[in-house]
Amino acid sequence: MKKIPSIGVVSLGCPKATVDSERILTQLRAEGYLLVGDYANADVVVVNTCGFIDAAVEESLEAIGEALDENGKVVVTGCLGAREGGDFVRGAHPKVLAVTGPNQAGAVLDAIHAALPPAHDPYTDLVPPQGLRLTPPHYAYLKISEGCNQSCSFCIIPSMRGKLVSRAPDDILREAEALVAGGAKELLVISQDTGAYGVDRKYRTAFHNGRPLKTRITDLCAALGELGVWVRLHYVYPYPHIDELLPLMAEGKILPYLDVPLQHGSPRILKAMRRPAAAEKTLDRILGWRQAVPDLIIRSTFIVGFPGETDADFAELLDFLRAAELDRVGCFAYSAVEGAPANAIAGAVPEPVKEERRAAFMAVQEAISRQRLQRRVGQRQRVLVDAMARGGRVIARSASDAPEIDGVVHLGKAAGLQVGDWVEVAITRADAHDLYGMVVSA
């Protein structure tokens, strides 16, 4: 009996990279390849890399090295693969079979075909309609565009993923419908710049199921909101037109949740970062959003220790944080990225100072988070069962919590529940990160 060619995949980096990996996996399975979870049984290993910060570069290079040591036949793709046209990876690991950049599934497949021809059986249906996914069945990432038109000084993503290219809205909706039909109860809308969706297409009108649909984020969200699942928006710059999404949140069409990458609160540092929004206008917009949608959850990420950041700049950042009272926040100490314009900015902040500021920042945010979560004690919430922990304990998420990056709702032991179930709970206590509750009705 002829051996079925097998592929192993290591997927690193952000949700956009996860979607790229899922597309590669789906096509490989459609071509008859067997997908395996270990090096020993794989004929070829694909490593989807991240190259955004130094730690991610190191992790990616280590993963490539491990795959080469354990297997020997490795195809590299992703953001790190785009650096220096692939020469950066080849310089570190000259034995890799091929190197491609992000969003290049065709090139990855070509490399795999060359090393390991497919053995396709045309009489076997190998791929479900929703494709193959790396996430659990109850949620899925929905990538609506590729690339970015911003020119932030600390970032090299546009040089890796290119300028903004929005998907056609009817194509997105077909994928969303297939994901929901396949069991997804939550769609996490992602891109590099979600609010800019459609700019490159000049908001042209498409058609889905005979209905006109503009290539605009508001129109797309309204259509997604008709699917009867949670729709959660990530990577949303605070553009003025984001206000148009608030009625959809108030009506329950999409979740009252915005992931807004603010990065800093000092106008001077934001200018040096080349960010597209001023801190004072952003704060006014946040306060306005909360007036319109009181239950709105805002998550964000920030960078401390950016070149030239003074004690006064950092104090402004903390003042902004206290005034904004964001619900979920991540903070990173600035890390120089090869090829980023910020590397030329004078006034590098010493590493110990960066870490001191990061710790001080997170201490302020922890107090804010604890206070905001405490307000939910006594409430009833509909949650989605996310995982079963050791001892039969149930871990769920509320509408306020994105998977992997936000908090969870601990329910203790609850008989009869399964991952992906909806359940109503009463919140009994909170800490700085998570909620705790008991099942009211399933």
Curated annotation (Swiss-Prot):
Binds 2 [4Fe-4S] clusters. One cluster is coordinated with 3 cysteines and an exchangeable S-adenosyl-L-methionine. [4Fe-4S] cluster 2 binds at residues 148, 152, 155. This is Ribosomal protein uS12 methylthiotransferase RimO. Belongs to the methylthiotransferase family. RimO subfamily. It comes from Acidithiobacillus ferrooxidans (strain ATCC 53993 / BNL-5-31) (Leptospirillum ferrooxidans (ATCC 53993)). HAMAP family: MTTase_RimO. It is found in: Cytoplasm. Coiled coil: none annotated. It is an enzyme of class 2 (transferase).
